[in-house]
């Protein structure tokens, strides 16, 4: 699909909220249901992996290493999709990322507890693709699957809003606060694990499907606006062309009249 407008639909506020809700749900499901492993917060996994390594507990250190490895592979996959499909006109590459993420998380809902390492790995893989592919909201960088960066950026913009009395900085700070709030609400969905068990991750699938559809609708509206603008510009160009043709005809008429006057003067000179 063509990208002709300044603000892409993937950077809109509704899409950001849906992605953060999904990110919070993913983390809650992996932590409460899958051996207390973080799907998104790889820093926590690395800390625990290091602690178990020092304790010479190889089994548990591997348990926390695998999500980190899958996360790294997920980033590479998102980069590959972006590289291969960013110039295609049929579908936006981010739609492909969302499609793959939805499929993976849907599969995770069927994986039994005996294969928690695989479930956590696939969830981390999907999370990495999401955080790599959706990195800005209204021109500001953010993360849809973790909060520390959003908290830091939000407080930075809030400080500037207070000290410099800038409303735009306050609005940006509010966007980061919204990101953290939506992630928290998504994480609260972890309470539903008592009712739906491993299927709770499908809440994340539903949120991502809504995100996918919202991006499609906004893309269609965006293309219609672009086409309308192009038609208007074409009419303006046609109008300008007609005016130029009129000016050219007028100049030709004036030139012809001047030539006629010169011819008359030549005849008078010859006559004298």
Predicted segments — roles?
Residues 2-235, 264, 270-272:
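Alpha-helical transmembrane segments of multi-pass membrane proteins
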Residues 234-237, 241-244, 248-251, 255-258, ...:
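The feature captures the hydrophobic core positions of alpha-helical coiled-coils
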